[in-house]
């Protein structure tokens, strides 16, 4: 009998809760897709006592990182933290403990990609990040799997949904930038602090990751020329 895949999660916010809910509510479907059962073994959060929309048994959730890092039964860890630290440190520890990683943290990979992928290569581990860049396409698997025999000469695309929404509304309706930004925030297209979206940071970090996939080179994301939306009036 094939043994199940046991996964750990670091963080259980909106994305983490969704991951746990899918795995818990659709075990047969997931098992067919993966070829064997996929089980949530342990989830690490800051406050295990916090009320959540999807509750886990008390022995499956804690604030003890070692419960995931040092568990030999866990082979894959979903690192669901934003920002650079402690995400970078935890990622390195997990890779060195023999875990494969899944993350959507584009800022982490764009900033520390060479180091993290270097550790992964050294340990014979992998880092999956489909959700970090245009996951709806999905572009990461398209480049790394479907187009491996193709020579890519350039990459063009819309990589930031917030900017796309704002520019489209400004062009079609002739609306003012600040007016459309407020609309985007009220409708959930923009964060309360939209800085990284409207100044080009989000798009350049994604482009840095795509550049690595397509051309095998790490380009510092901050060195990529970018022009934000703040100075556009109409």
Segments predicted by a language model, with ranges:
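A short hydrophobic/small-residue beta-strand
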Residues: 101-102
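Short acidic, glycine/serine/threonine-rich loops at helix termini
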Residues: 20-21, 54-56, 113-116, 138-145, ...
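Rossmann-fold NAD(P)-binding glycine/threonine-rich loop
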Residues: 86-96, 106-144
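NAD(P)-dependent dehydrogenases' Rossmann-like dinucleotide-binding region
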Residues: 152-163, 225, 229
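Substrate-binding/catalytic subdomain of NAD(P)-dependent oxidoreductase enzymes
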Residues: 179-234
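Oxidoreductase and adenylate-handling cofactor-binding alpha/beta cores
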Residues: 139-152, 163-178, 205-219
